[in-house]
């Protein structure tokens, strides 16, 4: 299906109770349980709810991937990525024009936990080679960047990162998802 079709039809089965054709917004904090710990698919909205589940399925289908996770904010998503992929002593390489919130997350939260952070001009082949030579766990780029809107060659960065044993994380806040 085309992205436009996926966006409006994928995972949009009529609600069995109301017959709604579009998943309604689940504006509740808790869901009924048949017994303590025995729920009907959802327990608390903070862990999942029908609205978020449908959104994740639709976005995954539009991107052509198996799974998707949505978060309440971009920084929450970034925190999850960093916490899940980087350990104390490992290096994260970012660009100099990194979004300020991401910079502060690295400096104020992850550096005190032992994660190392280096800013390098990843558009410059010599600076990129030097940064990759330091053995980073992650290369972190925004494309386009915030605030300067610099665009990186993601395919080239991914290939070089892979060759050097690093992961590439791309924040595409300003780019459309598909």
Name these PLM-found stretches.
Residues 30-79, 101-108:
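Conserved N-terminal alpha-helix of the aminotransferase class I/II PLP-enzyme fold
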Residues 84-102, 120-121:
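Conserved PLP-anchoring active-site segment centered on the Schiff-base-forming lysine
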Residues 87, 132-139:
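Short acidic/histidine-rich motifs immediately flanking catalytic phosphotransfer sites
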Residues 113, 163-164:
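Helix C-cap/helix->beta junction micro-motif
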Residues 138-156, 166-178:
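Conserved PLP phosphate-binding loop immediately N-terminal to the Schiff-base lysine helix
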């Amino acid at each position: 299906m085309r992205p436009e079709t996926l966006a409006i039809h994928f995972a949009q089965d009529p609600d069995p109770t109301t017959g709604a054709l579009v998943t309604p917004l689940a504006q509740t904090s808790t869901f009924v349980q048949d017994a303590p710990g025995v729920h009907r698919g959802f327990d608390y909205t903070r862990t999942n709810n029908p609205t978020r589940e449908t959104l994740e399925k639709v976005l995954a289908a539009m991107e052509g991937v198996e799974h998707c996770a949505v978060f309440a904010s971009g920084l929450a998503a970034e925190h999850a990525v960093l916490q899940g992929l980087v350990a104390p002593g490992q290096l994260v390489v970012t660009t100099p024009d990194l979004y300020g919130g991401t910079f502060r997350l690295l400096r104020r939260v992850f550096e005190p936990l032992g994660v190392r952070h280096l800013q390098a001009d990843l558009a410059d082949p010599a600076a990129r080679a030097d940064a990759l030579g330091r053995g980073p766990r992650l290369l972190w780029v925004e494309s386009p960047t915030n605030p300067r809107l610099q665009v990186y060659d993601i395919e080239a960065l991914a290939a070089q990162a892979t060759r050097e044993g690093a992961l590439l994380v791309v924040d595409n806040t300003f780019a459309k998802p598909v």
